[in-house]
């Protein structure tokens, strides 16, 4: 058996946390031979701490062979101590009458604090995934608040958009999800994201040529993927928690264990390529190997794609401007 690794999860008693923790503890994220110690953070409110205790009782009751230990806390410095992986799931949801700018600021404070705590106590190789929305900007804030950690350690979750797009394309083209390669999602995890299947293939056949429907792409596919979260809230009365947890598992598993040359989408700090300013956390196609991600380079960007990529970049720039004074 390998040495246990430490996995920190924030918002651990929330809806996504509840869908996530049992799968991490069963080995779905890091492999069936990798023991884990779960370090679980919840807000310092009695109700949340009680709920966390209940979740930990259930985790105990599963008797997972790979669960080597657990702590529950309201202190980020305890939760992130020596963490090898950190899934930042907890964030403040948008309340009634709350402007997006207010939401950015409230979450800004949370992610400044968490970035500072990671900077102080986490493993220097910690892999950070921000799930809590607005994910890209929250990841940017955490990254900027952790100057002693490599910027590349901070990522945002675009995998839910990626997985949503996969299924829409599979259904449209009449192919199996598992057969689709080279799909990507550019930009922000928001309705402005740009899901791009120009390079996608299934069994060697180009899917753009197979689907061959620009109207469907613009008027059906992109809006369906972009507004899927809202559609689920409307149908279920609750946000998409299980599918978000599933995407987080996919993202971290691929980063840790590799993608065998397959493209996946991750929100990562830009290196200036594809016309995205350096440092902006932006969804791009990557492959993963030996615990590192590598962006897919040199893809051609056509006029429609440039327009969509710039639109989602503009939103990210606006978000960044809204919290700029907090990072001084």
From Swiss-Prot:
It is an enzyme of class 1 (oxidoreductase). InterPro entries: L-lactate/malate_DH (IPR001557), Lactate/malate_DH_C (IPR022383), Lactate/malate_DH_N (IPR001236), Lactate_DH/Glyco_Ohase_4_C (IPR015955), Malate_DH_type2 (IPR010945), NAD(P)-bd_dom_sf (IPR036291). The keyword Oxidoreductase applies. It catalyses: (S)-malate + NAD(+) = oxaloacetate + NADH + H(+). NAD(+) binds at residues 11-17, 107, 114, 131-133. The keyword Glycoprotein does not apply. Keywords: NAD, Oxidoreductase, Tricarboxylic acid cycle. GO terms for molecular function: L-malate dehydrogenase (NAD+) activity. It comes from the Bacteria. The active site is at residue 189. Substrate binds at residues 94, 100, 133, 164. GO terms for biological process: malate metabolic process; tricarboxylic acid cycle. Its EC number is 1.1.1.37. HAMAP family: Malate_dehydrog_2. Belongs to the LDH/MDH superfamily. MDH type 2 family. Catalyzes the reversible oxidation of malate to oxaloacetate. NCBIfam families: MalateDH-SF1, PRK05442.1. This is Malate dehydrogenase. It comes from Acinetobacter baylyi (strain ATCC 33305 / BD413 / ADP1). The gene is mdh.
């Amino acid at each position: 058996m390998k040495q246990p690794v430490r996995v920190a999860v924030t918002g651990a008693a929330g809806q996504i946390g509840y869908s996530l923790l049992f799968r991490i503890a069963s080995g779905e994220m890091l492999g069936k031979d990798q023991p884990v110690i779960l370090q679980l953070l919840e807000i310092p409110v009695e109700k949340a701490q009680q709920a966390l205790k209940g979740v930990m009782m259930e985790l105990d009751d599963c008797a997972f062979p790979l669960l080597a230990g657990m702590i529950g806390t309201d202190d980020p410095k305890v939760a992130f101590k020596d963490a090898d992986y950190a899934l930042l799931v907890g964030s403040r949801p948008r309340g009634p009458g709350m402007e997006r700018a207010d939401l950015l600021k409230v979450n800004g404070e949370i992610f400044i604090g968490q970035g500072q705590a990671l900077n102080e106590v986490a493993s220097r190789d910690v892999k950070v995934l921000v799930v809590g929305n607005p994910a890209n900007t929250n990841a940017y804030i955490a990254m900027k608040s952790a100057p002693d950690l490599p910027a590349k350690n901070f990522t945002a979750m675009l995998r839910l958009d990626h997985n949503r797009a996969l299924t829409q394309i599979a259904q449209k083209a009449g192919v199996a999800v598992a057969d689709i390669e080279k799909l990507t999602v550019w930009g922000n995890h928001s309705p402005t994201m740009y899901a791009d299947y120009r390079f996608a293939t299934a069994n060697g056949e180009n899917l753009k040529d197979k689907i061959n429907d620009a109207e469907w792409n613009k008027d059906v596919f992109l809006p369906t993927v972009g507004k899927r979260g809202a559609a689920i809230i409307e149908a279920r009365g609750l946000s998409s928690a299980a599918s978000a947890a599933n995407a987080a598992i996919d993202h971290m598993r691929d980063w840790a264990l590799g993608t065998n040359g397959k493209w996946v989408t991750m929100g990562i700090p830009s290196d200036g390529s594809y016309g995205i300013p350096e440092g902006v956390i932006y969804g791009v196609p990557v492959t993963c190997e030996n615990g590192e991600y590598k962006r897919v380079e040199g893809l051609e960007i056509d006029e429609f794609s440039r327009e969509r990529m710039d639109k989602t970049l503009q939103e990210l720039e606006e978000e960044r401007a809204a919290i700029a004074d907090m990072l001084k």
